[in-house]
Amino acid sequence: GHHPGIFMQCGPVRHRVDARTQAAVRPFEHRVLVRPTAFQRLKPPEADKRLQFQALYRALIDDDARTHRICEDVVSCVREGRSPLVLTERNEHLDRLAQALEAHVRHVVVLRAGMARKERERASAHLAAIPRDEVRVVIVTGKHVGEGFDDPRLDTLFLTLPVSWRGTIAQYAGRLHRLSDGKQEVRIYDYVDLDAPMLARMFDRRCRGYEAIGYTVLLPASAIPGWPVDVILPADPVWKRDY
């Protein structure tokens, strides 16, 4: 960060970039659509937080109803003419999403971390060759997004597994911010698993991350006042105060 050597080499700070200010001058709206899920933990949480997190990820990946709902939303967006980026943190989850979507979308392009160079080049060439008037879905792992992935057509992000660090949120959302003809709104679908306290707290942190980069967070109409009976409201007071 602020090591003296940086200032010695580069001089004093002349300008600071604010993410909210940048969002305000872009020629499109920035919105997050919250999608509460009916995910329920079947086992008591692990005492070790790291093991608990891994167990929750495993359960989320295995939740077929949750995956089906995500794919329904993706297909709906494609039919609107949107260009979605479906993002997951696990290769197994990526494969399940791809298999489900290939039955409904002609072009499903899969990019994952650890791909061989030639395999990655073939997938990138396939993506580049798809005409603008043909629908497509890009499915990636978070690690691949961090490897310089860039596609100006993207206007919708599906966050299919929970993350919380603000820098990760900014990096993922940034894939939507390239200017492209006809882009009027960028949209993030956030799948919220509120029955698990750890995941509810992660949602809290994501909301603060979205705000910090200029996004408006939109709750589903069912949350006010009739929250679905199979989804428990989080106990976190920050969530209740904000929403």
Where are these regions (language model features)?
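Post-DEXD/H (motif II) to motif III coupling segment of the RecA-like Helicase ATP-binding lobe
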Residues: 1-33, 210
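Conserved nucleotide-binding/hydrolysis micro-motifs of P-loop NTPases
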Residues: 14, 21-25, 37-41, 91-93, ...
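Conserved helicase ATPase core of P-loop NTP-dependent helicases/translocases
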Residues: 85, 95-96, 105-146, 168
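Conserved SF2 helicase motif VI
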Residues: 156, 164-188, 204-207
